């Protein structure tokens, strides 16, 4: 963002949380049931939640925003590390 900003190019990132898409099929059914409880809003987001964040950043409303990560997770990050499907082995502390 700092390198491209002088050229009028904005660089941002969207970081979605638990979003109800076909990607959920990668998780076991018992894990997907827990996704509704992993954030303060007590629901999963949907593709429109993410799309509206992208529109916000790309529209005139985001014209002075660069170098940012827009987290669209219903507040999940506020709760710390959440593993609704269980902690993967490579993240476990022994």
Regions found by a protein language model. Name each.
Residues 13, 29, 34-65, 74:
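C-terminal helical subdomain
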Residues 23, 41, 76-78:
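Methionine-biased hydrophobic packing positions in alpha-helices, especially
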Residues 66-94:
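Short C-terminal tail/terminal secondary-structure segment
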Residues 2-6, 63:
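Alpha-helical segment proximal to the catalytic Tyr-Lys
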Residues 23-29, 83-88:
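Conserved mid-core segment of classical short-chain dehydrogenase/reductases
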Residues 6, 15-26, 72:
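Short, flexible catalytic-loop segment of classical short-chain dehydrogenase/reductase
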